[in-house]
């Protein structure tokens, strides 16, 4: 085995190092790098096919992240005990890795390329997602694949003291108000061009704001985008050091030979421009998406008919002609924006489309909101549930459950098309995660609002930024559901067109402007704080001043949208919907948890059956936490009263008569419930009206109601009972039948007392046996009776 090549450098502002290593693992891979921070490490490989697959008219890049449970010292919890489909975290890391890398490959490179990150170890302190980006860039740099890198990436967190922390641990992230993941490349002038941004507020950010932490607004965010450049440069420098070490050890890196693929030749483009430029110039002024697409398709059909028929100059090149039509359409759209400041639908560069908002669109839902901006329409539905509906996670991070769920669905009919309907694709998972990240900071914690929340965004119509439409409709449905969020959240998608040194920022982009532009820039937030940001660019980065101006332009649009949303619903409803469960949370002494649950859940199950409420019991090591929920409030209140009666049972009074119910039968008597949480012992000697009886079951059965009088309460609170009035005389049989029944025989275990002796059990012994659990689980209908401490056991 060859000696590995390893380079390492300290991360400024921390006590940790970033390490890159190659030559130890995956020797047959074209590029393979292990990246490490702390004890978290990933192996990323990069490989490309030698030839272009026939018929491929796009760059076939795939990025996969393989999370191995052994990295965290776990065995997968699935039935087969091995990893299956990627987790949501893995899919999001795939997208995070893909987005900055894709525009950095050489133009015309169409060879199938695959990047695979395998998580080898996690220390539960350092996340592995940013390592994947840096390792992928390094692997591509030593692979020979035509990649215009290196790219560096960093996560920074904004602390409550107003400082940006590089590569924060999980604990540091939880204690911060905002996180930024930024990837970029270093320019010739030493500046860093930002290629990708993924950012959002933390779950407790608004709690920190209430305690005085500085809010993250546009100026703070712009400062963060500038601050991150030092750590991006450090990563890039380390990758260059690795490349230099590889060359010094193994010689020059052999580049992958490939033939650039051109979608069309300049001659084809010129012919298309001559044939249909006028038709396309007219088509790109049509505001309605379907009509515009129809006009563009008609122009493409005309070009194909004119240029590709038998004997024509470009016969057999239909695909090239169609690509040239698309390229000409893009050119015309961009030219009109830059030169005239007019967009496809006639708007100016800062104009919003018509915006509308509604709530309560689904009467049976707990909360619902409908948001529309132009031809983009999204309905969001909020469902509230008990905390036990939190999603359990099997991840490689310290997070093991999720209580705020956002599911995004975009069926093909939202674009007037046909297609596959079913499980979500990576895009849908990514859009749902972005919308969740934008809204989660304003959602109250589970301690303040005990519900599990599931939000579902249904895209009804798509023409630009359905993810930000999901943010707006989520905010509407949460307020309609009565969730006390800390402020309405709106979102907007911005675009950019760059021609030479001229940058034009677009507000509220259409789908076509997204496709033909140079940047997709999404911003979400409340009136005074940003909660999420996502940026992707197709060019060599965006200057800092352009980004700062775009943030301010986005703020103007967000505030306009908030006005429309506030007109629909200005504040969360005072109460949750009638159809939603009503939830109350109680804190009880931890030593009472067992009493509330009962043996094998007997007590809590009985309360649930009698009240119809849903009850869950947990503890945090110091106190017990009881959560009670029911759609009807009275059911919740009844269950609450029953729990409180167990925790602090009412006191019985000596000499008072109670109507009780037999809840347990032992060989020495019957336990009778006389008050919620309060039982007393009716000794066998008090039964039978002065006559000796051989078994309690001769006169009482479980569930019988009986009037009893409190005879004695000892200093430990144990209650002794006697029957009120005439003692019970037995079951359904006549007195004669009972008297004619032969006496019970006593069987004894080896070493027991003489046969026929009746065991004498004291009042204290009876209670102690019951409390110690010696009597077993005596539910309704049970025949089992616990034996005494001397080994004797009665048999019928």
Enumerate the predicted regions with their spans.
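Short glycine/threonine-rich beta-strand-turn micro-motifs
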Residues: 295, 303-304, 308, 620-631
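Long, charged amphipathic helices and adjacent flexible linkers at domain junctions
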Residues: 256-258, 262, 560-587, 633, ...
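Intrinsically disordered, low-complexity mixed-charge segments
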Residues: 610-611, 616-624, 630-668, 674-678, ...
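Short flexible coil/turn linkers enriched for glycine and charged/polar residues
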Residues: 1-3, 12-16, 26-29, 37-41, ...
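Flexible, glycine/charged-enriched surface loops at secondary-structure junctions
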Residues: 107-113, 148-150, 235-255, 290-291, ...
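Mobile "lid/hinge" segments at catalytic clefts and subdomain interfaces of large enzymes
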Residues: 145-284, 478-574
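Extended amphipathic alpha-helical scaffolds
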Residues: 1-49, 53, 150, 247-397, ...
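Glycine-rich, flexible beta-strand/loop modules in the N-terminal catalytic cores of phosphate-handling
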Residues: 29-114, 119-126, 193, 197-210, ...
């Amino acid at each position: 085995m060859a000696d590995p090549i390893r380079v390492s450098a300290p991360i400024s502002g921390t006590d940790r190092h970033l390490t890159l290593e190659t030559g130890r693992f995956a020797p047959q891979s074209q590029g393979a790098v292990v990246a490490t921070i702390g004890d978290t490490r990933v192996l990323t490989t990069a490989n490309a096919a030698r030839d272009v697959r026939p018929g491929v008219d796009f760059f076939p890049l795939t990025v996969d992240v393989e999370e191995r449970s052994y990295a965290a010292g776990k065995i997968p919890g699935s039935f087969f005990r091995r990893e299956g489909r990627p987790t949501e975290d893995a899919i999001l890391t795939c997208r995070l890795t893909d987005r900055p890398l894709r525009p950095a490959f050489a133009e015309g490179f169409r060879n199938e390329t695959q990047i695979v990150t395998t998580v080898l170890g996690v220390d539960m302190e350092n996340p592995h997602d940013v390592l994947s980006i840096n390792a992928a860039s390094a692997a591509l740099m030593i692979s020979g694949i035509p990649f215009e890198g290196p790219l560096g990436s960093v996560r920074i967190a904004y602390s409550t003291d107003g400082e940006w922390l590089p590569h924060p641990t999980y604990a540091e992230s939880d204690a911060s108000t905002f996180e930024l993941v930024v990837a970029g490349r270093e320019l010739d002038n030493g500046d860093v061009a930002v290629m990708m941004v993924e950012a959002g507020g933390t779950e407790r950010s608004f709690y920190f704001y209430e305690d005085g932490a500085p809010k993250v607004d546009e100026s703070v965010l712009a400062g963060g985008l500038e601050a991150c450049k030092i750590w991006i440069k450090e990563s890039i420098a380390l990758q260059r050091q690795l490349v230099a070490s590889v060359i010094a050890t193994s010689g020059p890196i052999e580049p992958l030979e490939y033939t650039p693929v051109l979608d069309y030749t300049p001659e084809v483009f010129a012919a298309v421009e001559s044939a249909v430029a006028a038709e396309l110039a007219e088509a790109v002024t049509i505001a309605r998406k379907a009509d515009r697409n129809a006009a563009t398709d008609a122009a493409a059909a005309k070009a194909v008919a004119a240029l590709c028929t038998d004997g024509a100059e470009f016969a057999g090149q239909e695909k090239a002609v169609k690509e040239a039509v698309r390229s000409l359409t893009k050119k015309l759209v961009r030219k009109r924006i830059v030169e005239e400041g007019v967009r496809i639908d006639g708007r100016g560069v800062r104009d919003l489309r018509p915006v509308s908002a509604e709530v309560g669109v689904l009467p049976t839902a707990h909360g619902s909101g409908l948001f529309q901006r132009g031809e983009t329409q999204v309905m969001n539905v909020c469902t509230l549930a008990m905390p036990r509906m939190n999603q359990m996670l099997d991840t490689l991070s310290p997070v093991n459950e999720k209580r705020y769920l956002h599911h995004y669905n975009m069926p093909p009919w939202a674009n007037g098309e046909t297609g596959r309907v079913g499980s979500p694709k990576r895009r849908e998972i990514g859009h749902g995660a972005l919308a969740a990240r934008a809204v989660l900071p304003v959602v109250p914690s589970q301690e303040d609002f005990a519900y599990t929340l599931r939000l579902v965004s249904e895209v009804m119509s798509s023409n630009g930024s359905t993810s930000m439409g999901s943010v707006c409709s989520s905010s509407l449905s949460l307020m309609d559901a009565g969730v006390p969020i800390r402020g309405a959240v709106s979102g907007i998608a911005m675009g950019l067109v760059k021609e030479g040194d001229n940058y034009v920022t677009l507000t509220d982009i259409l789908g076509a402007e997204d496709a033909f532009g140079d940047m997709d820039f999404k911003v979400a937030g409340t009136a005074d704080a940003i909660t999420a940001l996502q940026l992707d660019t197709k060019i060599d980065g965006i200057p800092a001043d352009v980004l700062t101006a775009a943030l301010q332009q986005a703020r103007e649009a967000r505030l306009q949208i908030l006005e429309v949303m506030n007109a629909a619903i200005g504040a969360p409803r005072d109460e949750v919907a009638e159809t939603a469960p009503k939830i109350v949370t109680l804190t009880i002494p931890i030593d009472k948890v067992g009493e509330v649950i009962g043996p094998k859940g007997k007590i809590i199950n009985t309360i649930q059956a009698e009240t119809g409420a849903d009850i869950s019991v947990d503890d945090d090591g110091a106190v017990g936490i009881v959560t009670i929920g029911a759609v009807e409030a009275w059911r919740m209140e009844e269950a609450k009263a029953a729990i409180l009666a167990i925790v602090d049972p009412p006191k019985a009074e000596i000499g008072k008569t109670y109507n009780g119910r037999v809840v347990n039968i032992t060989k020495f008597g019957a336990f009778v419930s006389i008050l919620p949480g309060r039982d007393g012992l009716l000794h066998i000697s008090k039964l039978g009206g002065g006559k000796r009886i051989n078994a309690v079951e001769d006169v009482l059965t479980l569930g019988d109601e009986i009037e009893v009088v409190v005879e004695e309460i000892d200093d430990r609170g144990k209650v002794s009972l006697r029957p009120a009035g005439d003692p019970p005389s037995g079951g359904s049989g006549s007195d004669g039948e009972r008297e004619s029944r032969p006496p019970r025989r006593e069987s004894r275990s080896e070493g027991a007392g003489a046969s026929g002796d009746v065991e004498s059990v004291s009042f204290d012994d009876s209670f102690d046996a019951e409390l110690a659990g010696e009597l077993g689980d005596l539910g309704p209908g049970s025949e089992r009776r616990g034996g005494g401490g001397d080994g004797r056991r009665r048999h019928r």
